[in-house]
């Protein structure tokens, strides 16, 4: 079990707010944590190592040119097959994680990637070039993805209680 949180829209002390939101879900990932914060978005992750036990499996994870940022909870059962397909398209992989398959799959297929996924998952991808946020979860809802729109702010997380620390 891992967990992630995030929000759009610039706020004062975004990194501190994100840290508090992440603390609410610390039980979901005791192995490590990671953050991505810029003027547009804040994304945080709590990790429980399962597939790639190295630090290379840490999140948030980026594509090659760092234009896409991903946080992901779950397991993609067919990630090895998808990885082979993506390598054939020219994608370069730096980890053995299923999360890296998601980010390259989104680059290659966009939202159509969802039709190819087999597993239990929830994830959010931020495109820095377009300022778009794309989130999805498995079709059976095994892995949770909660979200709320509060004014101009979009919040999301693996547990709804993480929203309590956001000022909106």
Question: In which residue ranges do the predicted regions lie?
Answer:
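Cysteine-centered catalytic environments shared across enzyme families
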Residues: 1-168
